[in-house]
Protein backbone atom coordinates (compact mmCIF):
# COMPACT_ATOMS: atom_id res chain seq x y z
CA UNK A 1 0.00 0.00 0.00
CA UNK A 2 1.23 3.51 -0.79
CA UNK A 3 2.72 5.42 2.13
CA UNK A 4 0.69 8.51 1.23
CA UNK A 5 -2.09 9.25 -1.27
CA UNK A 6 -2.56 12.12 -3.71
CA UNK A 7 -5.88 12.83 -1.96
CA UNK A 8 -4.18 13.29 1.43
CA UNK A 9 -1.57 15.58 -0.11
CA UNK A 10 -4.20 17.67 -1.93
CA UNK A 11 -6.42 18.03 1.13
CA UNK A 12 -3.47 19.24 3.21
CA UNK A 13 -2.42 21.74 0.53
CA UNK A 14 1.01 20.17 0.03
CA UNK A 15 0.90 21.21 -3.66
CA UNK A 16 0.95 24.97 -3.03
CA UNK A 17 4.44 26.37 -3.56
CA UNK A 18 5.69 29.92 -3.22
CA UNK A 19 5.08 32.90 -5.50
CA UNK A 20 6.71 32.48 -8.88
CA UNK A 21 9.05 35.44 -8.29
CA UNK A 22 10.41 33.74 -5.16
CA UNK A 23 11.69 30.48 -6.55
CA UNK A 24 14.83 28.44 -6.89
CA UNK A 25 15.26 27.23 -10.50
CA UNK A 26 16.72 23.96 -9.17
CA UNK A 27 13.19 23.08 -8.01
CA UNK A 28 11.92 23.15 -11.63
CA UNK A 29 11.77 19.31 -11.94
CA UNK A 30 9.29 19.20 -9.05
CA UNK A 31 6.98 21.95 -10.35
CA UNK A 32 3.81 20.96 -12.21
CA UNK A 33 2.57 24.41 -13.30
CA UNK A 34 1.94 27.90 -12.01
CA UNK A 35 -1.47 29.24 -11.12
CA UNK A 36 -2.21 32.90 -10.32
CA UNK A 37 1.45 33.62 -9.67
CA UNK A 38 1.97 30.62 -7.38
CA UNK A 39 3.87 27.47 -8.29
CA UNK A 40 1.97 24.19 -8.02
CA UNK A 41 4.14 21.26 -6.97
CA UNK A 42 3.89 17.99 -8.91
CA UNK A 43 2.30 15.71 -6.31
CA UNK A 44 3.07 12.54 -8.27
CA UNK A 45 6.73 13.32 -7.60
CA UNK A 46 5.93 14.10 -3.96
CA UNK A 47 4.24 10.70 -3.51
CA UNK A 48 7.34 8.97 -4.90
CA UNK A 49 9.72 11.04 -2.80
CA UNK A 50 7.74 10.49 0.41
CA UNK A 51 8.08 6.73 -0.20
CA UNK A 52 11.87 7.04 -0.67
CA UNK A 53 12.19 9.07 2.53
CA UNK A 54 9.90 6.70 4.41
CA UNK A 55 12.05 3.71 3.43
CA UNK A 56 15.27 5.49 4.43
CA UNK A 57 13.90 6.57 7.83
CA UNK A 58 12.35 3.15 8.48
CA UNK A 59 15.69 1.47 7.77
CA UNK A 60 17.52 3.99 9.98
CA UNK A 61 15.21 3.22 12.93
CA UNK A 62 15.37 -0.51 12.21
CA UNK A 63 19.14 -0.35 12.65
CA UNK A 64 18.76 1.47 15.97
CA UNK A 65 19.59 4.88 14.47
CA UNK A 66 18.20 8.20 15.68
CA UNK A 67 16.51 11.08 13.87
CA UNK A 68 16.57 14.72 14.89
CA UNK A 69 13.44 16.66 13.85
CA UNK A 70 14.20 20.35 13.12
CA UNK A 71 11.54 23.00 12.54
CA UNK A 72 11.69 26.37 14.28
CA UNK A 73 9.19 28.36 12.20
CA UNK A 74 5.80 28.95 13.84
CA UNK A 75 3.92 26.66 11.45
CA UNK A 76 6.25 23.75 12.28
CA UNK A 77 6.92 24.05 16.03
CA UNK A 78 3.94 22.08 17.30
CA UNK A 79 4.08 19.27 14.72
CA UNK A 80 7.82 18.84 15.23
CA UNK A 81 7.47 18.45 19.00
CA UNK A 82 4.37 16.23 18.87
CA UNK A 83 5.58 13.87 16.16
CA UNK A 84 9.14 13.56 17.53
CA UNK A 85 7.75 12.71 20.96
CA UNK A 86 5.23 10.27 19.47
CA UNK A 87 7.99 8.23 17.85
CA UNK A 88 10.50 8.66 20.68
CA UNK A 89 12.98 10.83 18.78
CA UNK A 90 14.65 14.21 19.38
CA UNK A 91 13.66 17.68 18.21
CA UNK A 92 14.65 21.34 17.97
CA UNK A 93 11.63 23.63 17.57
CA UNK A 94 12.62 26.95 19.16
CA UNK A 95 15.95 28.15 17.85
CA UNK A 96 18.89 26.35 16.34
CA UNK A 97 21.88 27.21 18.51
CA UNK A 98 25.01 27.44 16.37
CA UNK A 99 27.19 24.39 17.01
CA UNK A 100 24.37 22.08 18.07
CA UNK A 101 26.01 19.43 15.87
CA UNK A 102 29.49 20.73 15.07
CA UNK A 103 30.21 21.66 18.69
CA UNK A 104 28.12 18.94 20.28
CA UNK A 105 30.39 18.48 23.30
CA UNK A 106 29.78 22.07 24.45
CA UNK A 107 26.04 21.59 23.93
CA UNK A 108 26.24 18.35 25.97
CA UNK A 109 27.74 20.36 28.83
CA UNK A 110 24.70 22.66 28.77
CA UNK A 111 22.42 19.59 28.70
CA UNK A 112 24.29 18.13 31.71
CA UNK A 113 23.60 21.40 33.50
CA UNK A 114 19.90 21.07 32.65
CA UNK A 115 19.85 17.53 34.10
CA UNK A 116 21.63 18.82 37.21
CA UNK A 117 19.03 21.56 37.76
CA UNK A 118 16.20 19.05 37.25
CA UNK A 119 17.75 16.78 39.88
CA UNK A 120 18.11 19.69 42.31
CA UNK A 121 14.43 20.51 41.89
CA UNK A 122 13.40 16.88 42.41
CA UNK A 123 15.66 15.95 45.35
CA UNK A 124 14.67 18.90 47.54
CA UNK A 125 17.86 20.97 47.12
CA UNK A 126 15.78 24.00 46.09
CA UNK A 127 13.87 23.85 49.38
CA UNK A 128 16.99 24.61 51.46
CA UNK A 129 18.35 27.37 49.21
CA UNK A 130 17.49 31.09 49.51
CA UNK A 131 14.38 32.03 47.51
CA UNK A 132 16.27 34.49 45.33
CA UNK A 133 18.81 31.86 44.32
CA UNK A 134 16.05 29.34 43.60
CA UNK A 135 14.30 31.88 41.35
CA UNK A 136 17.53 32.39 39.37
CA UNK A 137 18.11 28.64 39.05
CA UNK A 138 14.52 28.04 37.92
CA UNK A 139 14.89 30.78 35.30
CA UNK A 140 18.12 29.14 34.08
CA UNK A 141 16.40 25.73 33.95
CA UNK A 142 13.43 27.09 31.98
CA UNK A 143 15.71 28.74 29.44
CA UNK A 144 17.82 25.60 28.98
CA UNK A 145 14.71 23.44 28.72
CA UNK A 146 13.18 25.74 26.10
CA UNK A 147 16.13 25.41 23.73
CA UNK A 148 17.57 22.01 24.67
CA UNK A 149 14.61 20.09 26.13
CA UNK A 150 14.01 18.25 22.85
CA UNK A 151 17.58 16.92 22.73
CA UNK A 152 18.29 16.47 26.45
CA UNK A 153 18.39 12.67 26.09
CA UNK A 154 20.45 12.72 22.88
CA UNK A 155 23.76 11.21 24.00
CA UNK A 156 25.48 11.34 20.62
CA UNK A 157 25.06 12.91 17.18
CA UNK A 158 21.89 11.81 15.36
CA UNK A 159 21.90 9.34 12.48
CA UNK A 160 19.98 11.80 10.29
CA UNK A 161 18.07 15.10 10.32
CA UNK A 162 14.47 15.73 9.27
CA UNK A 163 14.18 19.42 8.40
CA UNK A 164 11.16 21.58 7.66
CA UNK A 165 12.26 24.47 5.42
CA UNK A 166 16.02 24.02 4.85
CA UNK A 167 16.22 27.67 3.83
CA UNK A 168 15.13 28.80 7.28
CA UNK A 169 17.21 26.05 8.95
CA UNK A 170 20.30 26.70 6.83
CA UNK A 171 22.68 26.59 9.83
CA UNK A 172 21.40 23.14 10.82
CA UNK A 173 21.73 21.98 7.20
CA UNK A 174 25.28 23.35 6.92
CA UNK A 175 26.34 21.65 10.17
CA UNK A 176 24.85 18.29 9.13
CA UNK A 177 26.52 18.50 5.71
CA UNK A 178 29.87 19.31 7.28
CA UNK A 179 29.60 16.18 9.44
CA UNK A 180 28.21 13.96 6.69
CA UNK A 181 24.87 13.46 8.48
CA UNK A 182 22.10 12.65 5.93
CA UNK A 183 19.27 15.17 5.64
CA UNK A 184 15.61 14.47 4.87
CA UNK A 185 13.63 17.68 4.28
CA UNK A 186 10.36 19.22 3.17
CA UNK A 187 11.63 21.40 0.33
CA UNK A 188 9.43 24.19 -1.03
CA UNK A 189 9.82 25.93 -4.41
CA UNK A 190 12.13 28.60 -2.95
CA UNK A 191 14.69 26.12 -1.51
CA UNK A 192 17.85 24.50 -2.90
CA UNK A 193 17.27 20.74 -3.22
CA UNK A 194 20.97 20.05 -3.92
CA UNK A 195 21.80 20.41 -0.23
CA UNK A 196 19.30 17.71 0.77
CA UNK A 197 19.89 13.96 0.53
CA UNK A 198 16.21 12.99 0.64
CA UNK A 199 13.91 15.66 -0.80
CA UNK A 200 10.16 15.85 -0.12
CA UNK A 201 8.87 18.55 -2.52
CA UNK A 202 6.03 20.29 -0.71
CA UNK A 203 4.47 23.26 1.02
CA UNK A 204 6.50 24.11 4.12
CA UNK A 205 4.21 26.96 5.23
CA UNK A 206 0.81 25.34 5.78
CA UNK A 207 0.35 23.78 9.22
CA UNK A 208 -1.72 20.88 7.81
CA UNK A 209 0.87 20.08 5.14
CA UNK A 210 3.72 20.14 7.66
CA UNK A 211 1.75 18.00 10.13
CA UNK A 212 0.87 15.40 7.49
CA UNK A 213 4.43 14.98 6.19
CA UNK A 214 6.05 15.12 9.63
CA UNK A 215 3.55 12.50 10.80
CA UNK A 216 4.59 10.17 7.97
CA UNK A 217 8.24 10.44 9.00
CA UNK A 218 7.27 9.59 12.60
CA UNK A 219 5.26 6.60 11.29
CA UNK A 220 8.37 5.39 9.45
CA UNK A 221 10.38 5.56 12.69
CA UNK A 222 7.72 3.59 14.58
CA UNK A 223 7.52 0.95 11.83
CA UNK A 224 11.31 0.67 11.74
CA UNK A 225 11.49 0.27 15.51
CA UNK A 226 8.96 -2.58 15.36
CA UNK A 227 11.22 -4.26 12.81
CA UNK A 228 14.16 -3.74 15.15
CA UNK A 229 12.27 -5.48 17.97
CA UNK A 230 11.37 -8.36 15.66
CA UNK A 231 15.01 -8.65 14.56
CA UNK A 232 16.13 -8.91 18.17
From Swiss-Prot:
CDD domains per UniProt: RPS2 (cd01425)
Keyword Ribonucleoprotein included in the entry's annotation: yes
Top-level taxon: Bacteria
Keyword hit for Electron transport: no
Organism from which the protein derives: Desulforamulus reducens (strain ATCC BAA-1160 / DSM 100696 / MI-1) (Desulfotomaculum reducens)
Any one biological process term the GO annotation gives: translation
Sample GO molecular function, one term: structural constituent of ribosome
Gene encoding the protein: rpsB
Pfam family, one: Ribosomal_S2
Keywords from the UniProt entry: Ribonucleoprotein, Ribosomal protein
The protein's name in its UniProt record: Small ribosomal subunit protein uS2
Gene3D superfamilies hit by this protein: Glucose-6-phosphate isomerase like protein, domain 1 (3.40.50.10490), Helix hairpin bin (1.10.287.610)
Record's GO cellular component terms: cytosolic small ribosomal subunit
Membership in a protein family: Belongs to the universal ribosomal protein uS2 family.
Endpoints of the signal sequence: none
Amino acid sequence: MAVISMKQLLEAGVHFGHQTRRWNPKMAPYIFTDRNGIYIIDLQKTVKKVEECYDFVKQLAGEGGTLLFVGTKKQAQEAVKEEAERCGMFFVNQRWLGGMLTNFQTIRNRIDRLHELERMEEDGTFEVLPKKEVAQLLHEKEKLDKFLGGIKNMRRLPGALFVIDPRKERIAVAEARKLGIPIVAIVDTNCDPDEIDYVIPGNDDAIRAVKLLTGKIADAILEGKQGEQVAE
